[in-house]
């Protein structure tokens, strides 16, 4: 893990305004406009079995590879995705409209554990499946109008290790002088990363390809959207 991390001291609770303080020790990054917390191997500290959860993700999730429009041309996204959530929690991003699939029992159990750990609620889940190191995600910020403003996003990693990169958004983070340096965070199997406000307003993140990686990675990003928009289900 790189980028000048700061570790909370023994017994220190990592608290942000507006939501509960997790009890376990975390690594944290705080820069102008950016707040991150990382619990290495968090999933392995729970009663949930990672191998069983990964097999569930492979077999029970209706994965698809959507297309996005870039400069007037359609391109498949370089990964597989699926959107789960409570009724009415649809989501628009990159020109796509995602109608939620219902929660599965194993993923509902993960949500329950996560909410108990963080003291904050989530009503939807974006799943990304990176089949190997060629799959990736470009620079973006999760700032769509459907998302509850300034609500934290929790990202859970399973499988292969990959590097999540952060950079100030065009226009700069709220700081005087030179913009903050980019940041890289290595995410391993079972790691839990929390992106707290105002990170999405001032920073972008992306997952570059890593051609040496031959195995798959699942990323579970728990979010909160404002219910109500209910487009037609995808066929």
Name the predicted role of every residue range.
Residues 1-235:
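Non-heme Fe(II) oxygenase metal-center motifs and adjacent flexible, charged/small-residue loops
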């Amino acid at each position: 893990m790189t980028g000048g991390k700061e570790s909370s001291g023994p017994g220190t609770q990592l608290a942000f305004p507006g939501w509960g303080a997790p009890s376990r020790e975390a690594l944290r990054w705080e820069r102008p406009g950016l707040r991150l917390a990382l619990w290495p191997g968090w999933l392995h500290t729970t009663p949930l079995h990672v191998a069983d959860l990964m097999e569930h993700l492979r077999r029970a999730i209706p994965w698809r590879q959507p297309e996005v429009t870039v400069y007037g041309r359609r391109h498949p996204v370089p990964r597989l995705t699926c959107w789960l959530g409570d009724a009415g929690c649809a989501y628009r991003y990159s020109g796509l409209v995602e109608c939620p699939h219902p929660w599965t029992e194993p993923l509902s159990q993960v949500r329950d554990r996560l909410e108990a750990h963080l003291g904050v609620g989530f009503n939807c889940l974006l799943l990304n499946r990176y089949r190997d190191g060629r799959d990736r995600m470009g620079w973006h910020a999760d700032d769509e109008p459907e998302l509850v403003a300034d609500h934290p996003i929790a990202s859970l990693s399973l499988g292969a290790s990959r590097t999540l990169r952060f950079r100030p958004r065009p226009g700069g983070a709220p700081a005087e002088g030179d913009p903050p340096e980019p940041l890289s965070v290595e995410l391993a199997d079972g790691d839990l990363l929390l992106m707290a406000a105002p990170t999405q307003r001032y920073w972008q993140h992306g997952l570059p390809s890593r051609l040496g990686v031959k195995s798959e990675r699942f990323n579970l990003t728990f979010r909160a959207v404002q219910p109500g928009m209910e487009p037609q289900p995808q066929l």
